[in-house]
């Protein structure tokens, strides 16, 4: 009986300690205080499948930009405005980054990750990933998944 009590007490202390440590670590993330970001991605990679084999191409010609505002890391929300207008997104603050996830009813998933920089920095490294697939087959054409990843920087708004 004593061993069961010790085990329960140990588990409770471990869970409480993990919860406190987690809260403290994200509180120290400077991205927790940012309410808006302007992001620019000058480099991107496209993934394709040719004859069933994965292939990638890296390109630098296209400039892709987006704005993220109404960021609330406590409620886990934000708004991304890019080429298709404003979209409500899920925001997830971690120890070393801030993720924004956009999901559509058609199955598209876009994820933007902003990485922590030095204390006091206003510019942050960022990656924007797009994942889309609409299965379709018509004579002479079969659709393939559309995936890409953009690399660039985000600057904190004022």
Task: Map each language-model feature to its residues.
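Contiguous, well-ordered beta-strand patches that form the walls/edges
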Residues: 71-112
């Amino acid at each position: 009986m004593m061993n069961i009590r010790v085990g329960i007490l140990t588990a409770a202390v471990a869970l409480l300690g993990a919860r406190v440590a987690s809260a403290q670590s994200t509180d120290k993330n400077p991205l927790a205080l940012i309410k808006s970001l302007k992001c620019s991605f000058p480099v991107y990679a496209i993934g394709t499948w040719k004859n069933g084999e994965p292939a990638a191409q890296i390109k630098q010609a296209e400039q892709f930009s987006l704005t993220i505002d109404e960021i609330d890391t406590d409620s886990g929300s934000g708004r991304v405005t890019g080429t298709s207008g404003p979209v409500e997104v899920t925001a997830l603050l971690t120890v070393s980054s801030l993720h924004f996830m956009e999901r559509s009813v058609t199955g598209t998933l876009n994820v933007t990750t902003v990485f922590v920089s030095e204390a006091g920095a206003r510019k942050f490294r960022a990656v924007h990933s797009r994942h889309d697939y609409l299965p379709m087959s018509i004579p002479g054409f079969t659709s393939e998944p559309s995936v890409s990843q953009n690399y660039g920087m985000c600057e904190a708004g004022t």
